[in-house]
């Protein structure tokens, strides 16, 4: 379960509030890049929420390897989206400079957690949505909320599955996230 969120986007919206087409164009390009990156790693794009993205990895797999391949795919997607996002920002920065003298600083934060979730269509008779639910989803979102711009944070369950395939650095331990699953 993977969440991305743009750090500094609310301030960007405030700075460029008179130029909504610039914001919409940037967001469209970012979301398109995120979707392509997720799909390239066999992920499922769960949803866009404001400037955030939620993706699932392993939904379509049998889980024979206890989520190892899917956890690696999620981390690879995060690693691929980070420079892709930076490229999109650099291109739009040229446009934004024409409309504001303020320095604009935004970055992408990401949180990844591996765990089981209830997956399916949720909603009403007139509108439903394919999504994932449960404590592991909430935990992944909370991890993402802790990520600084440019940072990819993974839970211990994800780290245990990817450590042999992905070089990682220790960012420290976060122990005060409420409702930690398991």
Predicted segment positions?
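Catalytic-core segments of nucleotide cyclases and related cyclic-nucleotide turnover enzymes
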Residues: 67-71, 75, 100-102, 109, ...
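Cytosolic nucleotide-binding catalytic cores of signal-transduction proteins
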Residues: 33, 78-81, 85, 140
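Catalytic core regions of nucleotide second-messenger enzymes
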Residues: 41-49, 82-111, 181
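Catalytic NTP-binding/metal-coordinating core of nucleotidyl cyclase/transferase enzymes
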Residues: 1-76
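Cytosolic regulatory/linker segments at or just downstream of nucleotide-handling modules
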Residues: 117, 146-182
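Alpha-helix/helix-capping structural signal
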Residues: 7, 116-117, 138, 157
């Amino acid at each position: 379960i993977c969440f991305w969120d743009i750090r500094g986007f609310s301030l960007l919206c405030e700075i460029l509030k008179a130029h909504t087409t610039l914001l919409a164009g940037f967001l469209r390009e970012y979301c398109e890049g995120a979707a392509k990156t997720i799909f390239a790693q066999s992920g499922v794009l769960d949803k866009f929420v404001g400037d955030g993205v939620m993706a699932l990895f392993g939904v379509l797999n049998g889980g024979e390897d206890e989520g190892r391949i899917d956890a690696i795919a999620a981390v690879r997607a995060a690693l691929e989206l980070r420079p892709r996002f930076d490229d999109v920002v650099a291109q739009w920065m040229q446009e934004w400079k024409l409309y504001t003298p303020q320095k604009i600083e935004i970055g992408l934060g990401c949180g990844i957690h591996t765990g089981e979730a209830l997956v399916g269509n949720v909603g009403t008779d007139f509108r439903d949505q394919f999504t994932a639910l449960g404590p592991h989803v909430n935990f992944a979102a909370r991890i993402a909320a802790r990520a600084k711009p440019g940072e990819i944070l993974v839970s211990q369950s994800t780290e245990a599955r990817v450590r042999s395939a992905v070089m990682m650095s220790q960012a420290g331990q976060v122990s005060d996230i409420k409702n930690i699953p398991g």
